[in-house]
Swiss-Prot record:
Source species: Homo sapiens (Human)
Subunit structure: Homodimer. Part of the SCF (SKP1-CUL1-F-box) E3 ubiquitin-protein ligase complex SCF(FBXO4) formed of CUL1, SKP1, RBX1 and FBXO4. Interacts with TERF1; this interaction is prevented in the presence of GNL3L. Identified in a complex with CRYAB and CCND1.
Name of the protein in question: F-box only protein 4
Function: Substrate recognition component of a SCF (SKP1-CUL1-F-box protein) E3 ubiquitin-protein ligase complex that mediates the ubiquitination and subsequent proteasomal degradation of target proteins. Promotes ubiquitination of cyclin-D1 (CCND1) and its subsequent proteasomal degradation. However, it does not act as a major regulator of CCND1 stability during the G1/S transition. Recognizes TERF1 and promotes its ubiquitination together with UBE2D1. Promotes ubiquitination of FXR1 following phosphorylation of FXR1 by GSK3B, leading to FXR1 degradation by the proteasome.
One GO term of the biological process aspect: positive regulation of protein polyubiquitination
Record-listed Phosphoserine modification sites: 12, 48
Consequence recorded when altering residue 12 to E: No effect on homodimerization
Pfam family, one: F-box-like
Record gene name: FBXO4
Domain F-box: 56-102
Subcellular location: Cytoplasm
Effect of residue 13 to S: In esophagus cancer sample
Effect the entry attributes to changing residue 8 to R: In esophagus cancer samples
GO molecular function: protein homodimerization activity; ubiquitin protein ligase activity; ubiquitin-like ligase-substrate adaptor activity; ubiquitin-protein transferase activity
Result for mutant: residue 12 to A: Reduces homodimerization. Reduces ubiquitination of CCND1
Amino acid sequence: MAGSEPRSGTNSPPPPFSDWGRLEAAILSGWKTFWQSVSKERVARTTSREEVDEAASTLTRLPIDVQLYILSFLSPHDLCQLGSTNHYWNETVRDPILWRYFLLRDLPSWSSVDWKSLPDLEILKKPISEVTDGAFFDYMAVYRMCCPYTRRASKSSRPMYGAVTSFLHSLIIQNEPRFAMFGPGLEELNTSLVLSLMSSEELCPTAGLPQRQIDGIGSGVNFQLNNQHKFNILILYSTTRKERDRAREEHTSAVNKMFSRHNEGDDQQGSRYSVIPQIQKVCEVVDGFIYVANAEAHKRHEWQDEFSHIMAMTDPAFGSSGRPLLVLSCISQGDVKRMPCFYLAHELHLNLLNHPWLVQDTEAETLTGFLNGIEWILEEVESKRAR
């Protein structure tokens, strides 16, 4: 099922509407609602005389709506710093509408989201009146949970013993981690992610060891991250190269021969497909999965089928439970408009999975984002082995 892909081609004309386009319009509408809200009368905050005296300044004497308008020009980091100065600003900077604005503004630009940080879409769809009157959601807490910079900071504060344990454990691990890579992004993009990987000097690709060969699949490709962390990828295509090329030229979807479809009477949530025996052998030996999604904004998706394919591949019946899933939210080149990774995560129903996952923005041409994703999945495998 292995093959090669063309590196470049002509972009197909985008259809008039896309899944992401509709949500993008809703988010832009949310921004406008925010700016309208700050100009309307809102319930005034009550503060003691002592607090007013403590925070007495030109800014605090302004109407609260004007204060919030000014605060909206600060970065979230600066806003948190301001909140640490005194009790008045600590209360003021927590305004739910202000943080809802930041969340709607910044969420589409974040390059990764994981199983711990995916925000509930319901909190983004809440009418502005409910946010103002009820404030049921702590939007500041949601923002900090989702923000990649916050996640990175908490990751760097990991206890030292965890790193030492992982290092000692790695000394007795003989085989490098092995991953199964599959998904429409391997086949539909005008630039081949696989060819970019195979020509990467940074990853040092070499043929896998013959003794680890799987009949009909091969032994995969060995890579090396930062000249020390070795890993192996088994690249799985849905069908033959000839059929993939024809589907790309005709702008259709090739029949995916990795899976067999269940009868309608046997259909269960997320299990409309099962892997064929040949692929099942792959699922039994890998340490994790890499799903390459087509994240180009004009692309129409069969989200339920994609979710079912992921569920079939990661079925714990064919291997240990809790194996990590890396989703590469992939586009051909940097100038192609992409759908945000949080939207792709929701549409793939990744919140229904019972194992760690990460969605990482990636460019096939430059491999931007790929190394970040690989670092994450290698850390997850190390952590799982050390437990």
